[in-house]
Amino acid sequence: DINFNSLADAYSFCRLINYVQAFLLIDSANQNYGWNISISKALNVWSNGSIIKSKLINTLYRDYSVDNILDDKKIFKTFNEFKPGLIDILDLSLKNDISLPCFSEALSYINQISSLSLSTKLIQAQRNQFGSHKINTN
């Protein structure tokens, strides 16, 4: 059975990831194309009559005080609060052969950007072990 609190947490986790990715895209455009878009001004615009208006935007706008959202400890605290619910829903979906790509990719994304041990280390270890591609005939 679906735990609706877990489902709400999973949905909230993914919504927050959407905003984080939007902020990072804006920041990248600022750096790469010389745009000068203020994240806090964008949040203000989005919170006032935008189609994506939500209480979450108001919270982010009020709390946004760091240059890089990934440096904001409150954001990661929120992710950690919602993460168990997301994992519960993904576990249930896997056991029932239900694909939830947005949910699973949101979890993968946060795991990749917050992990000290990335999956690329496994790839590098494989390259270190098997990189010569020599066939041992002994």
Residue ranges and their predicted role:
Residues 1-94, 100:
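C-terminal substrate-binding/catalytic lobe of Rossmann-fold NAD(P)-dependent dehydrogenases
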